[in-house]
Amino acid sequence: GVFCGEACAQASCSIAGCECIAGLCYKN
């Protein structure tokens, strides 16, 4: 649930432990 400070166009994020949800990277 914490925003990782990165937008994403695909399912993966460049920041480790973060996942793409609704176009933005979140971690827990």
From Swiss-Prot:
Pfam families: Cyclotide. GO terms for biological process: defense response. It comes from the Eukaryota. Keywords: Disulfide bond, Knottin, Plant defense. This is a cyclic peptide. Contains 3 disulfide bonds. Disulfide bonds join 4-18, 8-20, 13-25. The presence of a 'disulfide through disulfide knot' structurally defines this protein as a knottin. Probably participates in a plant defense mechanism. This is Cyclotide vodo I1.
